[in-house]
Amino acid sequence: VDFSRLSDGQKSMLYLSLVLTSQSIYHSVRNSEDNSFDIEKLRPPIFALIALEEPENSLSPHYLGRVIEALKQTTQHNDAQAIIATHSPAMLRRVSPEHIRYLRLNGLRTTMIRMICLPDKSDDAHKFVREAIQAFPEIYFSRLVVLGEGDSEEIVLPRILSAKGVPVDSSAITIAPLGGRHVNHFWRLLSQLEIPHITLLDLDVARFGGGWGRIKYANDQLKKFEPEKILPDN
């Protein structure tokens, strides 16, 4: 097939395949697994930096997954690193939070760079927070995050906000039902990323652990995170 007849996605995949294949050949020759090439003439690079800009513009989500897996295999060696710039939740869902670097413009129009800080691995909250972040990667692109209790908020809140003239998608609002668990870790994460957020709590008297205990739990967590914002004793 003539190169000019390929789509943008196919051209991207072809170019990336050539780069990754050349890296694979370098590794095979260097490790004496392939004698078809003379390493002196091949002259493999000491270090390769593979940069992809918004691959989601021309590739389907399933191809994105294949690209990430191929890059992971290539970067297992110490002679290559991959950087992907993306606005796609589908891409972030396939990447561990520890490998994400969050870029955002501040009020001075200067780019700030943040790492994703998770609870300590020995903490029970680590797994929950990690899975929640991967389940709702939209939070990285949000102007406002609403931390809700259950699935009903995902149905009701968008309709209420739309009726008030604040469409969820147009306003870049993400509603994340977390069941009220480990809210302090999400407060810390969102505050670090400078993403505005609101926490909704309901009494849920009929549920185990419900009632005013829910409010007390959130207030106790707030005392650890931002003591100046806790509820007054009276």
Locations of regions flagged by a protein language model:
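Switch/communication elements of ASCE P-loop NTPase nucleotide-binding domains
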Residues: 2-135
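Acidic, divalent-metal-binding catalytic cores of TOPRIM
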Residues: 101-234
